[in-house]
Amino acid sequence: MTTTNQEPILKATHFRSEGDVNTTPAREKWNESLNDDATQAMLKRDSDVFLHQAMSTPCLDTLTAAEGIYIQDATGKKYMDFHGNNVHQLGYGHPHIINKVTQQMASLPFSPRRFTNETAVQCAEKLTQICGGDLNRVLFAPGGTSVIGMALKLARHVTNNFKVVSLWDSFHGASLDAISVGGEACFREGMGPLMAGVERIPPAVSYRGAFPLRDSLSLRGQNSGDANETACDVHYADYLEYVIEKEGGIGAFIAEAVRNTDVQVPSKAYWKRIREICDKHNVMLIIDDIPNGMGRSGEWFTHQAFDIEPDILCIGKGFGGGLVPIAAMITKDKYNTAAQVSLGHYTHEKSPIGCAAALATMEVIEQENLLEKVQADSAFVREQLLQMKEEYPVIGDIRGIGLLWGVELVTDHITKTRAFDEAEAVLYQCLNEGLSFKVSQGNVIQLSPPLIISRNELEVALSVFEKAIAKVCKDFEYL
């Protein structure tokens, strides 16, 4: 095969790492099925006015409304949103958040730099309270990518080292500094030289990792994604120390506590070893909890499920309650040493509206006991998905935490060959039946519902999903 022919194949593989590919024949067939004239007209207007980019063009459908766990298109069709770009922890249009933001807009809609305001201070105080431990210093920013940049700056300042270790297949945002430390080729494609001093190591992947697991997966149960004490993946952490010692000058290690897109859940032992290594070598541990924070794991923040504390925590997306973009970097008082450095300096740094939304989000999670609810829902989802795994041979692995689950489809359980076509077929079958989710790595179905979802809604969604899996198994002759 020539290099020319290889390039499209490589690009398709790269783009599958983050989400479902929107230029496949299956997507074209889906777009053709949208036979509403108003929908097609809107899609054309969108295509004519916006810059086209990978994974966003062409659009899947048009939306006119969103409420609770549902998004609604121009024809009135509703989708249960199990994707939501991870801003939908509390679903859409939560009345408490709308009320608090509306009140804030009427009194103080914006706070210029050099001034502070009661809402921002209250929000920061509440945030440090739920973080607990030594995470007691906060900076706000308009979005998650921005706080990643702030964290990298702070780590350089504190350690006086500019080098960073990250994980292959990681995603930390789409700005130049964020794609520099990210591990997905699709975002670096054609961008030329990026930020210097980035080393990458393999992530602790339980099902098809770069290194074999040292202990039998049976020790971790049928679900390869239990956040437990099993030490079968600790050698992935040991490789971090190898790189730190060989490379030298490492200032930070950045990672998600749980990889969001294809739901990779390391063991507690892995994260405890990472924490030990960072402490030993004076490397700052940056946890990117932008997609999973605010309760998705069943804890306020995902690292809390692993009994560790980072030096810097980055959050965003769902922090604004699905209403207002806001993100935060939380760190320790001992790192409050950058008074002469502009770590953020963002126009909307102490946004009263953003902080009102974030404060209301934290209040809803507490008032509605969503952390406890997520833990109960997690056990239910695990049981249902494991039953499907036993029945349908296309399912190779089930892994998850809280209300974040990955279902990996394979054509063969021995070779673990990725079932690309089958995963796409499941996606569009579910979309037809009103269930929306993303597909990562080309074959991992990510199920990420709003935390407010009722048990009945959860049962309906899983029923739709199972019927799609059953149909694909029949159509592709697995059964």
Swiss-Prot record:
Entry protein name: (R)-1-hydroxy-2-aminoethylphosphonate ammonia-lyase
One Pfam family linked to the record: Aminotran_3
Species of origin: Vibrio splendidus (strain 12B01)
Function description: Involved in phosphonate degradation. Functions as a lyase that catalyzes an elimination reaction on the naturally occurring compound (R)-1-hydroxy-2-aminoethylphosphonate ((R)-HAEP), releasing ammonia and generating phosphonoacetaldehyde (PAA), which can be then hydrolyzed by PhnX, encoded by an adjacent gene. Thus, catalyzes a reaction that serves to funnel (R)-HAEP into the hydrolytic pathway for aminoethylphosphonate (AEP, the most common biogenic phosphonate) degradation, expanding the scope and the usefulness of the pathway itself.
Matching NCBIfam families: PRK06082.1
InterPro entries: Aminotrans_3 (IPR005814), Aminotrans_3_PPA_site (IPR049704), PyrdxlP-dep_Trfase (IPR015424), PyrdxlP-dep_Trfase_major (IPR015421), PyrdxlP-dep_Trfase_small (IPR015422)
Enzyme Commission designation: 4.3.1.33
The protein's required cofactors: pyridoxal 5'-phosphate
Annotated catalysed reactions: (1R)-(2-amino-1-hydroxyethyl)phosphonate = phosphonoacetaldehyde + NH4(+)
Keyword tags: Lyase, Pyridoxal phosphate
Other observations noted: Phosphonates represent an important source of bioavailable phosphorus, in particular in marine environments, where the bioavailability of phosphorus is often a limiting factor for bacterial growth.
Class of this enzyme: lyase
Family: Belongs to the class-III pyridoxal-phosphate-dependent aminotransferase family.
UniProt cross-references to SUPFAM superfamilies, sorted A to Z: PLP-dependent transferases
Entry GO MF terms: 4-aminobutyrate:2-oxoglutarate transaminase activity; lyase activity; pyridoxal phosphate binding
Residues with N6-(pyridoxal phosphate)lysine modification: 317
